[in-house]
Amino acid sequence: DRGAAWTAAIMGVPARTVIVLGAPDCAAMVHRVAALCADPVEEVRLERKSPLAAAASPVKLADLGRGDALIAFSRREVLSLRAALMARGRSVACVYGALSPEVRRAEARRFREGQADILVATDAIGMGLNFGPLRRVVFSALAKWDGREQRPLSVQDIKQIGGRAGRFGHQDE
């Protein structure tokens, strides 16, 4: 979806070394862009060191706990879920794309420092903020509006967002 933006970012960055982190299926694109610039590419593949698994059954709001992230796909849904959790006495941090970078960072810090038990966020969660240890990532839906249509989440969407949970060296349990 964001090929042009990635190409511009990779080709336009004024740096001697560019490190691109991504899913294995983006490697071919990185090689093609680098070839256009006659730049060398060193590809390093890493394996996830902690398992990522789907839950056997849906998770209820009442079963969310400290360190959980609940992912929604609209600001309206994020705010609705936040209100429902707060009505249950839970402390909640929220992150979605329309928030300013400063507010997103502040909310991430509140969650990371334990001032909020649960994080409710859009898929902006996968875009570079440090939330600290996420116990698990729970999806409120398995489809999202992509700007043109409502579509099922792809395996890559789920891996990118869900992969924020249980990162090696970040879990106490």
Describe the residue ranges of each PLM region:
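Conserved ATPase-coupling elements of RecA-like P-loop NTPase cores
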Residues: 1-6, 81, 129-133
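Post-DEXD/H (motif II) to motif III coupling segment of the RecA-like Helicase ATP-binding lobe
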Residues: 2-47
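Short glycine-/polar-rich loops that comprise or flank the Walker A/P-loop
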Residues: 13-17, 37-41, 65-67, 88-92, ...
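Conserved nucleotide-binding/hydrolysis micro-motifs of P-loop NTPases
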Residues: 15, 24-28, 48-53, 75-78, ...
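Conserved strand-helix element at the start of the C-terminal RecA-like helicase core
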Residues: 19-22, 26-27, 64-88, 92-96
